[in-house]
A protein has these predicted regions:
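Short alpha-helical functional segments enriched in proximate histidine and acidic residues
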Residues: 3, 49, 57, 77, ...
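Helix-turn-helix
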Residues: 3-37, 41
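Histidine kinase transmitter module recognition
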Residues: 6, 30-31, 77, 95, ...
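Short coil/turn segments at alpha/beta junctions that flank glycine-rich nucleotide-binding fingerprints
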Residues: 6-10, 60, 81
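Alpha-helical elements of Rossmann-like donor-binding domains used by nucleotide-donor carbohydrate transfer enzymes
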Residues: 16, 37, 41, 66-69, ...
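Amphipathic alpha-helical linker/stalk segments
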Residues: 42-69
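Amphipathic alpha-helical packing segments from all-alpha helical-bundle domains
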Residues: 45-51, 98-122
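Amphipathic alpha-helical segments used for helix-helix packing
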Residues: 79-98
Length: 122
């Protein structure tokens, strides 16, 4: 995560990742088949944690208070995970089309929380 955030997905090698986590390069393949799978897993975990944390938020009846709660949640969640957020937004272009579609679907689910509020507030 740190290496991708600092140097970018394309600039980081599997050898660098292995050295960073303290294993031999060959041993890294026991945990992930390739760099693409690692990137996808990091992004997927980030989005699933975001969705889970959002579901855990209490629902407020007042639309203005609901927008405020959503905004505070969104900002706090993202400030607590700057590397994951950076990767989730900046490295989408490096996903395979299939992996991109999966992450984009998770992102749409999160955005739907805001759109649901918007519709209910009208």
């Amino acid at each position: 995560l740190e290496l991708f955030a600092r140097h970018g997905f394309a600039a980081v090698s599997m050898r660098q990742i292995a050295a960073h986590v303290g294993v031999q390069a060959g041993a890294l393949y026991n945990y992930t088949p390739d760099k693409q799978s690692l990137l996808f897993g990091l992004m997927q975990r980030h989005m699933e944690e975001l969705l889970q944390a959002r579901r855990a938020q209490s629902v407020v009846a007042n639309p203005v208070a609901q927008l405020e709660a959503f905004s505070r949640f969104h900002i706090r969640f993202h400030l607590a995970r700057p590397d994951a957020v950076f990767i989730a937004y900046m490295e989408l272009r490096n996903l395979t089309p299939e992996n991109f579609a999966t992450i984009e679907s998770l992102r749409r689910r999160y955005e739907d929380h805001f759109l649901d509020w918007w519709r209910s507030a009208q």
